[in-house]
UniProtKB/Swiss-Prot annotation:
It is found in: Secreted. Residues 1-26 form the signal peptide. Glycans are attached at residue 106. This is Serine protease 28. It is an enzyme of class 3 (hydrolase). GO terms for molecular function: serine-type endopeptidase activity; serine-type peptidase activity. Its EC number is 3.4.21.-. The active site is at 77 (charge relay system), 124 (charge relay system), 227 (charge relay system). PROSITE patterns: TRYPSIN_DOM (PS50240), TRYPSIN_HIS (PS00134), TRYPSIN_SER (PS00135).
Length: 274
């Protein structure tokens, strides 16, 4: 089994939880504090791939979610540039193990949120259109999106899923099975206080805006390779995606991680997928 190429990409404020395909070699990427997940439990989860000439294969760089039979939602920082060529990306669906013998799906179009800011990570969202409609099944189906009027808080049952590192320097081992972890949503005011209480300038500089959502606790949350993945909550007898993994510091070590809030971009999402 070949190795994933990972890089902790630092921005001015924090670290994005993205795997890299071009800089250095390390073992492949699971969620901090998580457990293995069985097939079919999270049928909207996808692995976003880019081709690596170093290992001559399509390697995992980010997570994503199926929100429509032809559309994937992920993080904007997972995409190389505003005019990125869709042909350099592929998507794996319906599988809990990375790198099983499976046909990867082609992307025909990429749309980055028009208000995305690469420094602050505001509106860190991107849509990817598949070249063909998915055939839904037990293992492949879209997740529900929230309503504008929906509310989510620490009392909700919310889960994060991904193939990211188990700890900052502890990658997932073969067979690279998808991991899940239950994490609490935190209100933005408490999240801001938590960051400002830290002594380092890096922590204090983190800005949390209304289009962001905080979730996770010490030892439970996303790490490198989890960017773009969905945060889902059980509400009204269905799973609803409330967030997209965006940024954090030290792989969920002491602080909540920061997600893009899906509700803040519903109009933009529906404009393109309908």
């Amino acid at each position: 089994m070949f190795r994933l190429l990972l890089l902790a990409l630092s921005c001015l404020e924090s670290t994005v939880f993205m795997a890299s395909v071009s800089i250095s070699r390390s073992k492949p990427v699971g969620i901090v504090g998580g457990q293995r997940t069985p097939p079919g439990k999270w049928p909207w989860q996808v692995s976003l791939r880019m081709y690596s000439y170093e290992v001559n294969s399509w390697v995992h760089i980010c997570g994503g979610s199926i929100i429509h039979p032809q559309w994937i939602l992920t993080a904007a920082h997972c995409i190389q540039s505003q005019d990125a060529d869709p042909a350099v990306y592929r998507v794996q669906v319906g599988e809990v193990y990375l790198y099983k013998e499976q046909e990867l799906l082609n992307i025909s179009r990429i749309i980055i949120h028009p208000d995305y800011n690469d420094v602050s990570k505001r509106f860190d969202l991107a849509l990817m259109q598949l070249t063909a409609l998915l055939v839904t099944s037990t293992n492949v189906s879209p997740v529900s999106l929230p309503k504008d009027s929906s509310t989510f808080d620490s009392t909700d049952q919310c889960w994060l899923v991904g193939w990211g590192n188990l700890l900052q320097r502890v990658p997932l081992q073969p067979p690279y099975q998808l991991h899940e972890v239950k994490i609490p949503i935190q209100d933005n005011k408490s999240c801001k206080r938590a960051y400002r209480k830290k002594s380092s300038d890096e922590h204090k500089a983190v800005a949390i805006f209304d289009d962001m959502l905080c979730a996770g606790t010490s030892g439970r949350g996303p790490c490198f390779g989890d960017s773009g993945g969905p945060l889902v909550c059980w509400k009204s007898n269905k799973w609803i995606q409330v967030g997209v993994v965006s940024k954090g510091i030290d792989c969920s070590n002491n602080l909540p991680s920061i997600f893009s809030r899906v509700q803040s971009s519903l109009a933009w999402i529906h404009q393109h997928i309908q």
